[in-house]
Amino acid sequence: MIIIKKIKWIDKEAQEAEVLLSDNNYCILCFSSPCTLSENSVFEDIIYGFNVENIFKLSQEEYAVEKDDKSYNHKLKGKFVDDRNSILQIGEFRIDLSDGEIPKDIIAGDFIEVSVSRIEIY
């Protein structure tokens, strides 16, 4: 189960916020606009990666979420579970990577690494 751990308002009037999600194994910082979420509630939706690049297949099973301290950039490692909809799974998180061009040799079931400039909640 993914929980909304923290909401940090960027602009409350514009409903723009940084949202920290956790499944107790991984934490992902997302941008949300409009943000209508509440702290400590369950989050069941998919999240979206933007400016998806540096996509490549891993030689072994690996899961990781690495955030750049100075930006919203993330390096993600996980299982590519849906090649039709470009979905990456890390723990309980399902991340839509359709903003990027997935190489044709990557298929569902492969483990991949990818960089995104931002992760969003709609």
Regions found by a protein language model. Name each.
Residues Q15-V19, R84-Q89:
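Short aromatic-glycine-enriched beta-strand elements
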Residues D23-L37, I90-A108, S115-V116, E120:
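Beta-strand/loop nucleic-acid-binding surfaces
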Residues M1-I3, I10-K12, N25-I28, K57-E61, ...:
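Short amphipathic alpha-helical surface micro-motifs
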Residues G49-N73, S117-Y122:
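OB-fold/S1-family single-stranded nucleic acid-binding modules
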Residues I7-K12, N24-Y26, F50-V52, K79, ...:
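Generic structural motif
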Residues M1-K12, A64-R84, V114:
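Structural detector for short beta-strands of small beta-barrel domains
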Residues N40-E53, G78, A108-Y122:
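Flexible glycine-rich surface loops and low-complexity tracts that mediate binding to linear polymers
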Residues Q15-L58:
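Acidic (E/D-rich), amphipathic helical modules within compact regulatory domains
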